[in-house]
A protein has these predicted regions:
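Catalytic machinery of carbohydrate-active enzymes
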Residues: 1-129
Length: 129
């Protein structure tokens, strides 16, 4: 648990049930979130009010990068080609930091690193206030 942190799920559609039973607080925006002809407009509006987006390789990652939001992207060991290999940055999205699996299927190191970086990032934000 990290103090002074609110987590908001931008997930929609299939797979929403995967977040049931998690053991931490998470704000969900409901099954009608960003539905219909204007898909992704609501997502952009929410993102513009977030200090940081943490996501996997989904449309949300590309959207966050395209609108210039600070984004931390978690990637499997062998990612989609656009993320290249052996980089922690993206030439397409300068506000994005890449967190990569070292071993296939092992997310422990990735999320341990994110937890440490997030704690440091939040501490820096508090010092600026």
């Amino acid at each position: 648990r990290i103090p002074n942190l609110e987590l908001i799920s931008l997930h929609k559609g299939e797979g929403e049930a995967q977040i049931n039973g998690i053991d931490f607080d998470l704000t969900t925006l409901g099954h009608n979130f960003d539905a219909g002809q204007d898909a992704f407009l609501d997502t952009v509006a929410v993102m513009m009010n977030c200090d940081l987006i943490i996501t996997s390789d989904t449309a949300v990652a590309h959207l966050a990068g395209a609108i210039g939001r600070q984004t931390w992207l978690v990637l499997k060991q062998i990612p989609y080609w656009v993320w290249m290999l052996d980089r922690t940055d993206s030439p397409w999205y300068p506000t994005m930091t890449l967190y990569r699996q070292k071993y296939r299927g092992d997310w422990v190191d990735v999320f341990d690193t994110i937890e440490q970086d997030l704690s440091s990032w939040l501490k820096q934000k508090e010092e600026v206030k």
